[in-house]
Amino acid sequence: MGRLILEHTLQGHKGRIWGVAWHPKGNVFASCGEDKAIRIWSLTGSTWSTKTILSDGHKRTIREIRWSPCGQYLASASFDATTAIWSKSSGEFECNATLEGHENEVKSVSWSRSGGLLATCSRDKSVWIWEVAGDDEFECAAVLNSHTQDVKRVVWHPTKEVLASASYDNTIKMYAEDPVDNDWDCTATLTSHTSTIWGIDFDADGERLVSCSDDTTIKIWKAYHPGNSAGVATPDQQTVWKCVCTLSGQHSRAIYDVSWCKLTGLIATACGDDGIRIFKETSDSKPDEPTFEQLTAEEGAHDQDVNSVQWNPVVAGQLISCSDDGTIKIWKVTE
């Protein structure tokens, strides 16, 4: 059995902490929460501490933050229906742009691999795609209304300009730009969960996706491209996503976040039962029928709901979590 070892417990925010995000270099992270503030933390020696507090960008709770792939920009999604773009061009972090258009709370934000596109989603049931036009200018490239309910999460594919979204309508949608008319279209709808899907994440090459839900299950989805060796039909020459594995029985309440480590292949979950669990693909796993086992679990990882987990993109086995209990924790996973 593996172990989840607590390395640091950090405090500073007032109220619940909704989101944490590692900088691409892995030596800095950002956090956000109910106090309408973003904190930038960095490691000095063996101590993590807040270096910057950004408190003038939003009027309500900040739900999620994400660094751009280049690490120069930070995007924050807020319940005030805006997304703010921050950069450190002058040595100090400044809010360079505020993206408006959503009618209700913005729940999630994600940068494409190139950094040229930004996606946001909202309680207004829409997904917006923004083009980075340079000089802190962002232009709306698409408004996608494929979901019938609140959209909880958006995540870009790690290598392609393909976007995934997860919703209160129990579905995941995939989007891509049509090469003929340059319009963004919904190319696939993934159905299997029986309740709200809170989190999604791609594996390292983007051929699989993990999802977590209010139905207390985790599901693994696999992409089947036109001409695939498994003989899965691909109507209209579009990639088909099939649910190839369901993990159930490990979580007693809603699973709010899931992170698939690009370095180790481990999957971490954040749960409403205050726990963090780590899953590993088994050695006899098959491509079209993968199997996963629980490597380790920390049942009382936090004192209240765990809202977010994210693997460090550089330091293998390092995991960060945040909670309604107002703490951030950094963990080391050993196999």
UniProtKB/Swiss-Prot annotation:
Q: Where are the WD repeats?
A: 12-51, 57-96, 101-140, 146-185, 192-231, 250-289, 301-335
Keyword check for Repeat, yes or no.
yes
Q: Name one GO cellular component term.
A: metallochaperone complex
Residues annotated as coiled-coil are: none
Q: Which UniProt keywords apply?
A: Repeat, WD repeat
PROSITE patterns xref list: WD_REPEATS_1, WD_REPEATS_2, WD_REPEATS_REGION
Q: Which GO terms describe its biological process?
A: iron-sulfur cluster assembly; protein maturation
UniProt keyword annotation of Transport present = no
Which Pfam families does this UniProt record tie to the protein? WD40 (PF00400)
Q: What does this protein do?
A: Essential component of the cytosolic iron-sulfur (Fe/S) protein assembly machinery. Required for the maturation of extramitochondrial Fe/S proteins.
Family stated for the protein in its record:
Belongs to the WD repeat CIA1 family.
UniProt name for this protein: Probable cytosolic iron-sulfur protein assembly protein Ciao1
The organism is Drosophila erecta (Fruit fly)
